[in-house]
Every structure is written in structure tokens, then in C-alpha cells.
Amino acid sequence: MCAKYIIDACKFLVKTYHIDGLRFDLMGILDIDTMNAVYRECCAINTDFMIYGEGWDMPSFLDFRQRASIGNNAQMPFIAHFSDRFRDVVKGRTASNEVNVKGYCSGALYLIDIMKNCLSASCTNEGMEAMFANPRNVVNYVECHDNMTSWDKLKECCKEDSKDI
């Protein structure tokens, strides 16, 4: 019943407001079949339709294999996921207990091979195992509405560095 409501609501938005895409917050709590159905039904209305969202693996009553999470992105070939891998490699870890963990851009140069992977949309095995089969499945970002801004993160994790660096 919930899946039907989500699908019908999305179709209504596409038909009524002529939107061409949706962003799903906490998409990982929804199931793969529902997300694929949303894409399929909305694409039938607007062939340029796209979906992207937060594919975090959230606690849920669903088995992991059914969740619309980033780890299951291969089962959602037309849906993109925000890449926390890219964010963490570029900026450094963002959890409140990891604010001092640097990323490549803040001086962790040992991450160069993983950075190459990230710059290839995590679609190659350069530096680490590929996460996505196609660049259309990933949204690379460094900053959004969550956690510290890049400036605040740099100030915190690089406070011991000299200004010459």
C-alpha cells in the first residue's frame, strides 16, 4: 500500500507540475522494487525523468538485499546515489568523532589512488574496487546540508598545519 502511494504521488507530481526528476532523502529505507517502479512509471510520462537520492544503508525491517541502498545500486540501473566515498576521500570523514581525519584535499596525499577511483565516478578498479557500473549512477559531492562545511572541516582538521602549505 505504501509503495502504491509513493508511486502514485510521484506520477502526480510529474504529470501535474511537469517535473523531470526527484531526489529521495533517506532512499535506503525504501525497497528496490518501489524505486524501480517509480522510475519506470515516471519515465513513461517524461522520458527525460531522473531519480537520485541518499542510498545510505539505514536500519529497516527490510533485508539488506531489498533496500534501495548504495550497496544495491546495480539493481537500480537508472537511479543515482550520492557518493559518500567521494566526499570522504576529498574532504575527509565527516562524523562528529572523526573531524580530524583528513581527506586528499586537506593533505592526506596517500589517498591519491582512491582519489583516482573517485574521479572516475567510482566506476573503475583504480585504487579500490568499483562501486558503480556507470557514471549515471553516482552523484559526486563534497558538501551539502549535512555536517561541517568544507571551510569548517579544513579549519578543524588542518589547524596544526602552517599557512605555507
Predicted feature locations:
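Conserved alpha/beta catalytic core and glycan-binding cleft of carbohydrate-active enzymes
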Residues: 39-41, 48-165
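Substrate-binding/active-site clefts of carbohydrate-active enzymes
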Residues: 1-17, 27-46, 50
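Broad hydrophobic/π-residue packing in well-ordered secondary structure
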Residues: 5-6, 12-13, 17, 22-24, ...
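The substrate-binding groove and active-site-proximal loops of carbohydrate-active enzymes
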Residues: 1-3, 20-30, 155-165
